[in-house]
Amino acid sequence: MQRLFLLVAVMLLSGCLTAPPKEAARPTLMPRAQSYKDLTHLPAPTGKIFVSVYNIQDETGQFKPYPASNFSTAVPQSATAMLVTALKDSRWFIPLERQGLQNLLNERKIIRAAQENGTVAINNRIPLQSLTAANIMVEGSIIGYESNVKSGGVGARYFGIGADTQYQLDQIAVNLRVVNVSTGEILSSVNTSKTILSYEVQAGVFRFIDYQRLLEGEVGYTSNEPVMLCLMSAIETGVIFLINDGIDRGLWDLQNKAELQNDILVKYRHMSVPPES
């Protein structure tokens, strides 16, 4: 009877856990958070604004903890590409290529040289237009990455049978600011942050079921929220705040004035007051 009880207990504990995947997942589009849905459902502007983004730097100086790698940064170095994508997805801005500007200029030189020599391809015979200048620049940086901001757990064990769970919260922070190209004035600035959740669940049994017979078993899994997705969400949230702030300051306007009370704009307007630490 005792053995049966132990066997049932182990089966119940293991049933609470997720089985490991049997095969690798297929390539797919990057998952997105609620901030992406809010960003893509903003009301339309009076007109789209030409914007340039040069480089969003990592100013945290943080590296992945041992034993990962002492030379791998704790946050992704692709914030510039993420910001360009967020600006385009908002349908409020027309991003201009600036990160790969030198590559673009080289291609234009090649086309002009071919046009002068008369060896240009059919699709490049039309004279090149001048590059479009931006109305504003969006600058910024990753200003903070704090690990183990909060951690905790809970567990229980009875006669060698038990389970426990632990969690840890990290935090990443981003600064974005809008700069007037004509004057260099900073028109708007915002700081956003996103927590990164990691947790672990374990269950096991360790008990002698008979003389010189030991029953021992462990099951468990861990889940780590991708830093890349959290950084993308923080940037998308920052873009929404910049758009909302620009509407309030009269920097740009809505196509339909009645959309000023749009649910998304109202929600982020209420969130514009930073919470107490």
Label for each model-derived stretch:
Residues 2-7:
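Sec-dependent signal peptide recognition
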Residues 12-15:
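C-terminal motif of bacterial Sec signal peptides marking the signal peptidase cleavage site
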Residues 17-48, 146, 154, 166-277:
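C-terminal/domain-edge helix-coil "capping" segments
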Residues 49-50, 54-148, 171-188:
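N-terminal segment of the mature soluble domain
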Residues 70-75, 114-117, 156-162, 195-198, ...:
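Short, low-complexity, polar/charged sequence segments that are solvent-exposed and flexible
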Residues 125-126, 160-164:
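Extracellular loop and loop/strand-boundary signature of outer-membrane beta-barrel proteins
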Residues 143-160:
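Charged, amphipathic alpha-helical segments
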